């Protein structure tokens, strides 16, 4: 049987919030079967919990924000992408501030943290959401779609009217039956344009942003000394974001996601539409792992 997974051990890290610029302590903890991923604002008394579910998404400007009343957790998508990529079903994410630390702008440091904590299989079947028919949302020329597919595939196309991105690969397809999330997607960093930074900072966004945790682009090129990690890093990061946003369904997906210029807002609209259209999906488990269209790396022992 494909089993649910949690962390073997508790692990901690420190970083800064991309948008808030605040120092934040992050603690990842094991959680019981059927808990899901739950964020905890440990700096508040009493502690406030926010389950990582599509219905709890509040703000989607520049990142995905979860809310519970007037309490929020910003920029959850990169950590959730790492959880999805490693097949973690159940975990507590404790934070000392209102934003997940940005680390290096990718999911790579979170993958390392989770692997360092070790993965533990639990005594319950992992639940997948299988897409049964097409579901699409559109906004202007932006589009996000779910399609049936025996496995998990993400295809994405971006179209930035910017001289630097015009010369870069702007579309990618990742079929996770043959491609490793860790190798192909997890290290793609978030990116930002110099021309937008003044506006963002005026609106209290990107206060913690720098070439240490983002690809920074001006009209002539990439400002990061070491350049890009891959020529398709921009579009691969959009795939990373989408995987994190999609994990707000609360389960791993069996299906295909297609995004055209989609972002956090449209991704969330697609999830809400899918959840509402109950004939478009079903929950499945696999007693025999060999019959499953998706496989996960074997749990690694904690280092």
UniProtKB/Swiss-Prot annotation:
Its cofactor is Zn(2+). Zn(2+) binds at residues 78, 237, 241. Keywords: Hydrolase, Lipid A biosynthesis, Lipid biosynthesis, Lipid metabolism, Metal-binding, Zinc. The keyword Repeat does not apply. InterPro entries: Ribosomal_Su5_D2-typ_SF, UDP-acyl_GlcNac_deAcase, UDP-acyl_GlcNac_deAcase_C, UDP-acyl_N-AcGlcN_deAcase_N. Pfam families: LpxC (PF03331). SUPFAM superfamilies: Ribosomal protein S5 domain 2-like. One of its GO terms (biological process) is lipid A biosynthetic process. GO terms for molecular function: metal ion binding; UDP-3-O-acyl-N-acetylglucosamine deacetylase activity. Pathway: Glycolipid biosynthesis; lipid IV(A) biosynthesis; lipid IV(A) from (3R)-3-hydroxytetradecanoyl-[acyl-carrier-protein] and UDP-N-acetyl-alpha-D-glucosamine: step 2/6. GO terms for cellular component: membrane. It is an enzyme of class 3 (hydrolase). Belongs to the LpxC family. Catalyzes the hydrolysis of UDP-3-O-myristoyl-N-acetylglucosamine to form UDP-3-O-myristoylglucosamine and acetate, the committed step in lipid A biosynthesis. This is UDP-3-O-acyl-N-acetylglucosamine deacetylase. The gene is lpxC.
């Amino acid at each position: 049987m494909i089993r649910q997974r949690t962390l073997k051990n508790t692990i901690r890290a420190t970083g800064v919030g991309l948008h808030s610029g605040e120092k934040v302590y992050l603690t990842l903890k094991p959680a019981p079967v059927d808990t899901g991923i739950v964020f905890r604002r440990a700096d508040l008394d009493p502690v406030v919990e926010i389950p990582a579910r599509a219905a709890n998404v509040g703000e989607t400007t520049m990142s995905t924000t979860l809310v519970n009343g007037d309490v929020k957790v910003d920029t959850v998508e990169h950590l959730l992408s790492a959880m999805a990529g490693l097949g973690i079903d159940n975990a507590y994410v404790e934070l000392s501030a209102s934003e997940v630390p940005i680390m290096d702008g990718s999911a790579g440091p979170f993958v390392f943290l989770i692997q360092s904590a070790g993965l533990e299989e639990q005594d319950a079947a992992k639940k997948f959401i299988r897409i049964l028919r097409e579901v699409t949302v559109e906004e202007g020329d932006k589009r996000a779609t779910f399609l049936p597919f025996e496995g998990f595939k993400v295809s994405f196309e971006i179209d930035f009217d910017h001289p630097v991105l015009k010369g870069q690969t702007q579309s990618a397809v990742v079929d996770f039956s043959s491609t490793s999330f860790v190798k192909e997607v997890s290290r793609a960093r978030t990116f930002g344009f110099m021309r937008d930074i003044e506006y963002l900072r005026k609106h209290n966004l990107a206060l913690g942003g720098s070439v240490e945790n983002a690809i920074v682009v001006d009209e002539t090129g990439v400002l990061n000394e070491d350049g890009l990690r891959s020529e398709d890093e921009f579009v691969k990061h959009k795939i990373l974001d989408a995987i994190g946003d999609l994990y707000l369904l609360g389960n791993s997906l069996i299906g295909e996601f297609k995004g055209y210029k989609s972002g956090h807002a449209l991704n969330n609209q697609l999830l809400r539409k899918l959840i509402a259209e109950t004939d478009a999906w079903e929950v499945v488990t696999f007693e025999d792992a060999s019959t499953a269209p998706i496989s996960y790396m074997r749990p690694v022992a904690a280092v």
